[in-house]
A protein has these predicted regions:
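Active-site metal-binding motif and surrounding structural segment of the metallo-beta-lactamase
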Residues: 85-132, 251
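Metallo-beta-lactamase
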Residues: 95-101, 105, 135-189, 233-252
């Protein structure tokens, strides 16, 4: 009888632990697109292919069973000069509501890197805590503005927002490579498109999903192991990162290309501009 009780207790403990394991529904939210189509040769190094391709701009929403609503990058949130090159910027508010999430419900924002299209922040998510690499933060708030620095891909307003968030205690440096920074969300840091960009492996109900934002520029880059023409500090490191991504998932379909409009034909469309990866 005692043995039976122990078996039952062990089973209940296992079931309880399983029910408490953090997992997420992963959504892709489109908020803008390039005004004109592009070609492979314009987007990928070492190719002369002229395949036509359309570029969309997206962020990722992770809806957890643990009360977490996490954005991976935060997109354009107010007008900047670069906006003239984009169509249909919707500032995410309406798109978020389609997923039954309000801006104030966002608990965390994880920045893959610091380009203007990834974090143009203006208090749109008042309760969000922001995660960024320390080296990334230091480079984009200090070093890049010194002589010889590179800062063309972001603007001073969003940089100041990062500084304000840090001063206000709403920013954490996420340098723990290979570890969970939030339950069910594991961080990887590897040289790639930008300054040691961050990549995430997110636990969903059925599979691990790899999120690299637009570090995985287009499916052409992923399929042909081709570095992008724009923003890659090291083409060799970028290609190594692509291989690392493939080793972390069971199926490459769970490596969404972060700016490829064809994503919306690869996964079920929840509604216009919103898809769920599953």
């Amino acid at each position: 009888m005692k043995r039976i009780y122990l078996i039952i207790f062990g089973l209940l403990t296992f079931l309880f632990a399983s029910s408490q394991t953090a997992n997420y529904e992963v959504y892709i939210l489109k908020y803008a697109s390039l005004a004109n189509p592009s070609t492979a040769s314009e987007q990928a190094k070492a190719t002369s292919a002229n395949d036509s391709m359309h570029v969309d701009f997206m962020v990722w929403l992770l809806k957890g069973n643990n009360g977490k609503n996490i954005l991976v990058d935060a997109g354009f949130l107010y007008g900047v000069d670069e906006a003239k090159d984009f169509n249909g910027i919707n500032y995410l508010k309406d798109t978020l509501q389609i997923t039954a999430v309000q801006p104030q419900d966002i608990t965390d924002i994880i920045l893959s890197h610091r380009h203007v299209e990834d974090f143009d922040y203006k208090n749109a998510f008042p309760n969000a805590h922001v995660w960024i690499q320390k080296e990334d933060y230091n480079y984009y708030t200090q070093t890049s503005w010194q002589k010889g620095g590179t800062n063309a891909a972001f603007n001073r307003k969003s940089v100041q927002n990062l500084i304000d968030l840090n001063n206000g205690g709403r920013l954490t440096f996420s340098d723990a490579a290979g570890k969970e920074i939030i339950p069910g969300v594991k961080l990887y840091i590897t040289p790639g498109e930008k300054f040691n960009s961050q990549y995430l492996v997110v636990k969903s109900v059925s599979d691990n999903i790899f999120l690299g934002s637009d570090n995985i520029w287009l499916y052409y880059n992923l399929e042909h192991a081709a570095a992008p023409t724009y923003g890659a500090f090291s083409a060799g490191s970028y290609i190594q990162a692509l291989q690392m991504m493939k080793n972390l998932v069971f199926d490459v379909k769970f490596i969404p290309a972060g700016q490829d409009a064809s994503l919306f034909s690869k996964f079920p469309l929840s509604t216009e501009g919103v898809i769920r990866i599953k």
